[in-house]
Every structure is written in C-alpha cells, then in structure tokens.
Design a protein with these regions (language model features):
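N-terminal ligand-binding/catalytic initiation module
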Residues: 1-155, 375, 381, 388-389
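Solvent-exposed alpha-helices and their adjacent loops that cap or buttress functional pockets
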Residues: 12, 55-60, 96-97, 122-124, ...
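Short, ordered loop/turn segments at secondary-structure junctions
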Residues: 69-71, 79, 108-109, 134-137, ...
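Glycine-rich phosphate/diphosphate-binding loop of Rossmann-like nucleotide-binding domains
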Residues: 74, 79-99, 157, 161, ...
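General beta-strand structural signal in soluble alpha/beta enzymes
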Residues: 105, 131-134, 155-158, 189, ...
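Adenosine-phosphate binding glycine-rich loop
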Residues: 158-159, 178-180, 282-390
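Rossmann-like adenosine-cofactor binding region
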Residues: 232-301, 307-309
Length: 390
C-alpha cells in the first residue's frame, strides 16, 4: 500500500479524524434546561465553591490536551502549528482507541518558551492532563519543567517519556534473553535530543550504571567544549570516565546501542567491535541507524527498531494511552519517575520468560492487555508515591 497517497485520501474524505459528541440528550425543553440554562448554573456554583468538583461535574476527569508548537513534527522538522494538526489529531485518536482517554489537539503559534508555558497554563483548568508533542529540543525540556512547576495536573512530553518507557521495557527483556545484568552492561546512545536524554535519565533511575551519550561531535563528557545546558547536565551523570572519541570509539566493547539519531550512523563493522551478544535498538525513523540484517551480520543478538515491518518495534502507543489512563484513574497530580518505571516493568512483564525470544521482547501494539496493564501499574505507583488524589 502507498501509505502517503492513501493517508491523503483518508484525510480529504473525513476532513479530520476526531469530532465532539454529546454525552447527554438534548431532545426536549427539559433536556435543554438541564444541559444549559437555567439548570447549568448549579454545577457552576458547586465548582466555584470547590474547584475539584470540576472533575466530578465536567469531562475534565478524562480530558487530555495534546499540545504542540509544530517545531519538531515527526521527521518533518519545524513545519508550523497548522501543519502539525494532522499528527495531533492522530494522537488524539490513539488516546481514545488504546486508553479510553478523550483528547483534544491544540497547536500554539509561538516559539517563545514563556509565552507557550503561560498559554498552556492559562487553559489547564479545562483538562485533566497535558501531553506535550513534537516540540524541539532543548526548548522542550524547559517548557516541560516550567509547566510541571506551575500546573497541578500531569504534564508529559511523550517524545521524551513514552519512548523512554518502551525502551526500558524492551531493554529489560533483551537483557534477559542475553543473560546480562543492567548494573554491569555498557550502554551507548546516539543522539542527544528529547528522546535520548529522557531514555538515559530513565535508565539511570532504573539502575543502569555505565552509560555514554554521543552526539554529532562524538562522546559527551564533563568538560567538553560547546555543550548546551542540558548536555552539560547529562555529562555530569554519564560517561563518568570522561572518555572522548567518536561513536565508533564509544561502541568498542559496549553491550547495548540505543539510537535515536539519524539513518546509517552505525555500520556492521562497528557492531563487530561490541561485546558478545550485543543489543541494538536502532530507532531512527523511517530509516534506522542500522538495518536489522546488517546488525545481525555484525554479531548483534537482539535488535529493535521503530518500524512496524521488523520485530521488536519501539512504538509509543504502547505507553502513553495507558500512562494517562492510570494517571486519570487516580487523579494524579504528576507523572513521576516511579510511575514511568512501573509502566516499563508492566510492559516487560506481559511477556513471560518462556515466551521471550530474540524477536519478541516487546508486546505488540494491538495486544489488548497493554493499556489496562500499564494503567493499573501507573495508578499503583501514583498511590505509592503520593501523587494520587483519589
């Protein structure tokens, strides 16, 4: 199938992938008076007395805003807010289909961090959660941090945390397949954008000890010239031996490669220099850092990509619907590291040790267990860590 042509036809036919539906009937004078004036004044007064009643008397309890500035849309780059709308609509469809979450797309016309933050904060009272989407790094880190400080609802940048959750889940099972321990393996990442940094942070939180990040200039280490503030922050907690060199240099003897960077950055020869039973997560889309057949030829044991036409797809739809479902179910005030790690552990646990193989380390997107299992784990973690409000 030519997905580009067929998708364009679908969008022309439907003129959008979402719509607003009423949950109550308006077919009589009494219906109208209850749904709107004069009856609607009473729930307004209840919410005025206690704003938390907005979760009980409106759709806020299940409503997520999917918000972008259009600056880093898929692999298309800075295409602007209007052009980002099809992706935001698509995200809303996935929220509903896989998590039962009502989501609404919002494309904001500003690249100014404070203006974006204030805009989102000003409308946050209408929503139970905020999903940030397709915002360029390093601006996305500052936006998320500031919104988390200001808002009392979950703020979650899926390009960071959804990818990190799935990666941790897949890597947990991949290590079982090859019989290695997270505390001992050497992990090398390619890329230092939103996804890579969040992946590394979550791996460190989960107990991985030996991680080196690489960008276009090679290994990132404390004291390297030209690092921006977020790379300096990561340099303080990774590559503690402060080794320089290229990506190829960093991969020598490494156990795990995680790529969220650019096509073709890894060769068969580079994989051959890695430790035995190497694990390769080549997640650049649509063309990975190295194709699975080349990685296999180089000696890799377990290989994952971001593509659906190869085994072990890293697909964020495995995470964000269930994460928000779980957060909403307990009216969480935040989505913290413990909740993300719980989501990853739940995903990994859906595949039994007997089922695990080199080509089956991550559940399939349409596995009906995924959403409910992730949601339950996230809700439990929210309760344990004091984020739950009901």
């Amino acid at each position: 199938m030519n997905y580009a042509e067929e998708s364009l036809k679908l969008h022309r036919r439907w003129r959008g992938k979402i719509e607003v539906n009423a949950t109550v009937p308006v077919s009589s004078k009494d219906d109208l008076s209850l749904a709107y004036t004069p009856g609607v004044a009473q729930p307004c007064l209840e919410i005025q007395k206690d704003p938390a009643q907005s979760y009980e008397l409106t759709r806020r309890h299940n409503l997520c805003a999917v918000i972008t500035d259009g600056s880093a849309v898929l692999g298309l780059g800075d295409i602007g807010p209007e052009a980002g709308m099809p992706v935001m609509e698509g995200k809303c469809v996935l929220f509903k289909a896989f998590g039962g979450v009502d989501a609404f797309p919002l494309c904001v016309r500003t690249k100014d961090v404070d203006e974006f933050v204030q805009t989102v904060y000003n409308i946050s009272g209408s929503f139970g959660g905020i999903n940030l989407e397709d915002i360029a790094a390093p601006r996305c880190f500052e936006i998320e941090r500031k919104l988390k400080e200001k808002c009392d609802i979950p703020v979650f940048h899926d390009d960071q945390h959804g990818t990190a959750i799935i990666t941790l889940a897949g890597l947990t099972n991949a290590l079982k397949v090859v019989g290695k321990k997270k505390e001992e393996v050497r992990v090398v990442t390619s890329g230092a954008g939103a996804a890579a940094i969040s992946i590394v942070k979550l791996l460190l939180s989960a107990g991985f000890r030996h991680v080196t990040m690489c960008d276009r200039k090679g290994a990132i280490y404390q004291g390297r010239e030209g690092l921006n503030w977020i790379k300096e922050e990561m340099a303080a907690v990774t590559n503690l031996e402060r080794k320089g060199g290229s990506l190829a240099d960093a991969l020598v003897g490494a156990d795990v490669f995680i790529g969220v960077s650019a096509p073709g950055t890894v060769t068969r020869e580079m994989v051959q220099t890695m430790n035995h039973d190497a694990i390769i997560f080549a997640c650049a889309n649509p063309t990975p850092e190295i194709f699975p057949d080349e990685a296999k030829a180089g000696g890799a044991r377990v290989i994952s990509t971001g593509r659906s036409d190869y085994p072990n797809q890293i697909n964020n739809v495995l995470a964000f619907p269930g994460v928000f479902r779980g957060a909403f179910d307990v009216r969480a005030s935040d989505i913290n590291e413990e909740m993300k790690m719980a989501a990853a552990a739940a995903l990994a646990g859906l595949i039994s040790d007997e089922e695990l193989t080199e080509e089956y380390i991550i559940p399939k997107a349409f596995d009906p267990r995924v959403g409910p299992t992730v949601a339950a784990a996230v809700a439990d973690a929210a309760r344990r860590t004091g984020e739950a409000r009901i």
